[in-house]
Amino acid sequence: MTTPTEFLPPIAPLDEALRKRLQHVIDHKTKPPGSLGQLEALALQIGLIQRTEQPRVQRPAMILFAGDHGIAVEGVSPYPQSVTAQMVANFLAGGAAINAFSGVAQSELEIVDAGVASPLPASERLVSLPIGRGTRNFAVEPAMTRDDAMAALAAGAARVRHHAALGTNVIGFGEMGIANTSAAACLMSRLLDVPIDACVGRGTGLDDQGLAHKRAVLARALSRHSHAIAPLDVLATFGGFEIAMMTGAYLAAASERMTILVDGFISTSALLVAERLAPGVRDYCVFSHASHEAGHRRMLEHFGAKPLLALDLRLGEGTGAALALPLVRAAAAFLAEMASFESAGVDNRDA
């Protein structure tokens, strides 16, 4: 049986022999050791990923995957499914938060139709790769077939390889899809063996009654699909086409030795699947922020992650990843450009 990793090159482990040398270089920059805080750990990680003491950020890119979810018919979101297509049109017109933030971060932005249910406007900025016109309702049946999940993984990987061929070495992923917090919560619950109540948040703004309804719907769905245990089966049962494409994108980005900016709750749920398929992907991930959405901090704990930002974001779209990109630039720049005590002629003798 074909597995998702068969169409990907292996993910190379980071060079632990280089770690000590990079740490020495960082510690001997013209600053007290540790005084750049979390940026020092980030610079070390980027140096390890790029295998150099002179890292560079080249043609950074953000890919936003959009798709609809059949579970939306269960009333788990206060917004109608049509909002997904409306927001994609907004992305294409340049009017969303991710457009503004990727512009500030000087990042390429690509919008991918992974499976939006409603028609989308024609645009040169849209990459149309729909696996289907929305997933099925996983409260009743699996969201997609295993073959659909595999096709989505391959499509996401192909988009990353496209950007790698253009020189991209830093990449982030965003998403859009009404009810995709429900899919992400079920992925988290099953893959981390966490009660669904700890995974479910208000999403786009559910009130208390709506939150209770969402929890009940998802609890029943998890019970109905108790047989889905293997990561690809979990993805096919509960995931969305945009989440599956993002999973493939993570795997390809790690295999291409890219620095990967991880966004919020939904993006991290896709990483949970990717990690189960290829654990080495984690080494290439920079966690941009701690989302305000319930469950995200538990995911971050699972990955042993210390996010760069804590801004109470809960928008998605890749906004947190875009906001963190300037910090990646800064970390790479200080490692590559900052003088050492010796080269600058600065006295570093103990007081």
Where are the model-predicted features located?
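N-terminal loops that bind phosphate or other acidic moieties
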Residues: 2-351
